[in-house]
């Protein structure tokens, strides 16, 4: 099965769907001030036609309510900054393209658009028709838009996904080189780490090269991804998956060879690795780059009347459901659908232990980029 066929969130609106489990998380809340600053710089740059129509794309938009929460933040930031800057008497039209792979459940987003437009008019005063939302399916490691046609490109929790599993794991090191893990975890061998870093470098360089061409000169990108900081990082969602899969092997429910022959196309770069790639590629300048922590259950609330122990268990089940909604399609394609309930039941147990220890944070990186002006524009 082709990777792009399984690299998507759980579809529909069922109990394990991304639409039901995703919510406005801490990462989105943390990103919003950076988003406003990025929009402010964008409006001041006086790009072509920006006072009439701002063209925006959300790359790797996923599906469900979170997609439109991101869109809402973008629209609110444009309107807020525009009002503060007193750019125009009339608001510009905003054209937003939602991008993800062809298998993404775009229909779950389209169903929400009528109510989203009405809410936007009621709360923001934006008349229906002044914000135009459409889909642009396809891999963001390929061309999506005409050259110099976009003002702002946004991506949250997407660029850590690779275009493919690193080929070096199979070609140079052989099947089973990454024993005991599904990704480039802290404990994996240096050659595995290098294979993943090489693939990320190749993919992120391609991403920057292609999409910088699609931006107007001095256009902006704002990218957020999961990252690593040091060897003391707390377990991230993929570490919890590693633990749960290894439990199934110990219990005899899964063959060890199944794990050793599977690697997920996901890489958590360091801030320095991202910085070096941007500087080496050369089409964009870094305006700011920061890291921050987000908690697994930051978006989850529960009645205080529940016992503390119940709090932890319910939160752990929420964490397991959220992780399941993101990773189940690609995991089920290799390990089989039948084992999924057992896998995520064990993941919930590990999540409960992590939460009980007062841990459960993962590191995030946010980077704001500006396309360097052409020599003729300087």
Curated annotation (Swiss-Prot):
Q: Which reaction does it catalyse?
A: 7-methylxanthine + S-adenosyl-L-methionine = theobromine + S-adenosyl-L-homocysteine + H(+)
Q: What does this protein do?
A: Involved in the biosynthesis of caffeine. Catalyzes the conversion of 7-methylxanthine (7mX) to theobromine and of paraxanthine to caffeine. Has a 5-fold preference for 7mX.
Q: List residue numbers at the site (Involved in substrate discrimination).
A: 154, 266, 337
What tissue expression does the UniProt record report for this protein? Answer: Expressed, at low levels, in stems, young leaves, floral buds and immature fruits (grains), but not in roots, old leaves and mature fruits.
Residues bound to S-adenosyl-L-homocysteine are 18, 61, 66, 100-101, 139-140, 156
Query: MF terms per GO, please?
Result: caffeine synthase activity; metal ion binding
Compartment annotation: Cytoplasm
* Cystine pairs: none
* Activity sensitivity to pH: Optimum pH is 7.5.
Specify the pathway: Alkaloid biosynthesis
**Which cofactors are named for this entry?**
Mg(2+)
Q: Protein name, please?
A: Monomethylxanthine methyltransferase 1
Question: Could you name the Gene Ontology cellular component terms for this entry?
Answer: cytoplasm
Q: How is it used?
A: Tobacco plants (Nicotiana tabacum cv. Xanthi) expressing CaXMT1, CaMXMT1 and CaDXMT1 accumulate caffeine and become less appetant and toxic for caterpillars cutworms (Spodoptera litura). Caffeine also stimulates endogenous defense mechanisms against other pathogens (e.g. tobacco mosaic virus and Pseudomonas syringae) by triggering the expression of defense-related genes.
